[in-house]
């Protein structure tokens, strides 16, 4: 353990004791990291600690951040996108999305993404590696420091497939909940759906967290297998009917409603017959559909569904008894919206 971010109070007390310090020094480090959310990122800046203790920690390679800000982009609607550099010279992006009462942090879980969804910029360069717990948590602290307010909600909808980094994902959720004091019910984990991993998510959540109170959002984006395979290559390995069955089991195991993300693509999946087919697929269990307007990226020629088709689609789902809402896009002018995050080339 060299990065102290992500450590429990017991971990930090043990670090202090290992260096011949009183246990309360570990609690001081804990407060400095989590309660004060200090903008300073170096061990030797923890001024509540004795100078000699700080020096020994730093000399031994301990730190409180693996990331640095390479670029800031503030959209007209107040959305902030940060391009962060990692210690191994990779790049990740995270987004702060403010409203009057909330600040939502959209977090990355991997450097790049292996899923290569055709409508998404993130997977165009493939997967480099998964993020560590400290790198996930640090995104929250950078957003808070840059926007000068506390994050209230978390969505794992940035770069990467969270369920392919499941252990660090769940350990970061534990720290977000226990250390940053953000309720699990204000955390959403989005997945394009990986075989066997939805069931594994619920089982591991109970093992690591003791419960499973966060929201699972499945990027469905199609009412049938044929359409889904054309826009999500990995769908060939996971039949849509099996995804739904695994989601039903997830609801039974956790008691939590599943959300389905549905990207509206003109002429692809946006017609009334698609709404009826989706309604039939989802009928009979606790779920919710988020309709998402497509956000343009350079490499593909998909287009947004027209407003009339979107409204008709939403109305038909509602008429068919499916809970549905329309997600508003944020940060479009700075490529900070859903599907637009990528490893931007750095100068």
Curated annotation (Swiss-Prot):
Binds 1 [4Fe-4S] cluster. The cluster is coordinated with 3 cysteines and an exchangeable S-adenosyl-L-methionine. Its cofactor is [4Fe-4S] cluster. Disulfide bonds join 106-338. It comes from the Bacteria. GO terms for molecular function: 4 iron, 4 sulfur cluster binding; metal ion binding; rRNA (adenine(2503)-C2-)-methyltransferase activity; rRNA binding; tRNA (adenine(37)-C2)-methyltransferase activity; tRNA binding. It catalyses: adenosine(2503) in 23S rRNA + 2 reduced [2Fe-2S]-[ferredoxin] + 2 S-adenosyl-L-methionine = 2-methyladenosine(2503) in 23S rRNA + 5'-deoxyadenosine + L-methionine + 2 oxidized [2Fe-2S]-[ferredoxin] + S-adenosyl-L-homocysteine; adenosine(37) in tRNA + 2 reduced [2Fe-2S]-[ferredoxin] + 2 S-adenosyl-L-methionine = 2-methyladenosine(37) in tRNA + 5'-deoxyadenosine + L-methionine + 2 oxidized [2Fe-2S]-[ferredoxin] + S-adenosyl-L-homocysteine. Residues 99-333 form the Radical SAM core domain. S-adenosyl-L-methionine binds at residues 160-161, 190, 219-221, 295. GO terms for biological process: rRNA base methylation; tRNA methylation. [4Fe-4S] cluster binds at residues 113, 117, 120. Keywords: 4Fe-4S, Cytoplasm, Disulfide bond, Iron, Iron-sulfur, Metal-binding, Methyltransferase, rRNA processing, S-adenosyl-L-methionine, Transferase, tRNA processing. The active site is at residues 93, 338. It is found in: Cytoplasm. InterPro entries: Aldolase_TIM, Methyltransferase_A, RlmN_N, RNA_MTrfase_RlmN, rRNA_lsu_MTrfase_RlmN/Cfr, rSAM. Its EC number is 2.1.1.192. It holds the Pfam family Fer4_12. GO terms for cellular component: cytoplasm. Specifically methylates position 2 of adenine 2503 in 23S rRNA and position 2 of adenine 37 in tRNAs. Belongs to the radical SAM superfamily. RlmN family. Reaction proceeds by a ping-pong mechanism involving intermediate methylation of a conserved cysteine residue. This is Probable dual-specificity RNA methyltransferase RlmN.
């Amino acid at each position: 353990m060299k990065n102290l971010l992500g450590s429990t109070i017991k971990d930090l007390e043990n670090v202090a004791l290992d260096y011949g310090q009183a246990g309360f020094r570990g609690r001081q480090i804990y407060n400095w990291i989590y309660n004060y959310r200090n903008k300073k990122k170096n061990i030797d800046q923890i001024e509540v600690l004795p100078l000699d203790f700080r020096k020994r920690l730093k000399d031994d390679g301990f730190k409180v951040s693996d990331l640095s800000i390479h670029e800031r982009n503030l959209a007209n609607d107040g959305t902030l996108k940060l391009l962060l550099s990692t210690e191994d010279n990779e790049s990740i992006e995270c987004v702060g999305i403010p409203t009057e009462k909330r600040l939502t942090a959209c977090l990355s879980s991997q450097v790049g993404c292996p899923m290569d969804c055709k409508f998404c910029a993130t997977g165009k360069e493939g997967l480099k590696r998964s993020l560590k717990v400290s790198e996930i948590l640090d995104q929250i602290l950078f957003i808070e420091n840059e926007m000068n307010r506390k994050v209230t909600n978390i969505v794992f909808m940035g770069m990467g497939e969270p369920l392919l980094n499941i252990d660090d994902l769940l350990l970061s959720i534990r720290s977000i909940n226990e250390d940053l004091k953000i309720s699990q019910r204000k955390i959403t984990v989005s997945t394009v759906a990986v075989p066997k991993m939805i069931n594994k998510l619920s089982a591991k959540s109970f093992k690591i967290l003791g419960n499973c109170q966060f929201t699972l959002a499945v990027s469905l984006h199609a009412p049938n297998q044929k359409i889904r395979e054309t826009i999500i290559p990995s769908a060939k390995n996971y039949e849509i009917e099996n995804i739904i069955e695994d989601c039903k089991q997830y609801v039974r195991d956790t008691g939590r409603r599943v959300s389905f993300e549905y990207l509206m693509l003109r002429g692809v999946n946006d017609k009334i017959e698609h709404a009826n087919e989706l309604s039939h697929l989802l009928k009979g269990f606790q779920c919710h559909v988020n309709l998402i307007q497509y956000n343009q990226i350079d490499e593909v020629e998909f287009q947004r569904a027209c407003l009339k088709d979107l409204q008709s689609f939403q109305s038909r789902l509602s008429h068919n008894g499916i809970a549905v809402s329309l997600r508003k896009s944020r940060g479009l002018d700075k490529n900070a919206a859903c599907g637009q995050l990528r490893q931007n080339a750095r100068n």
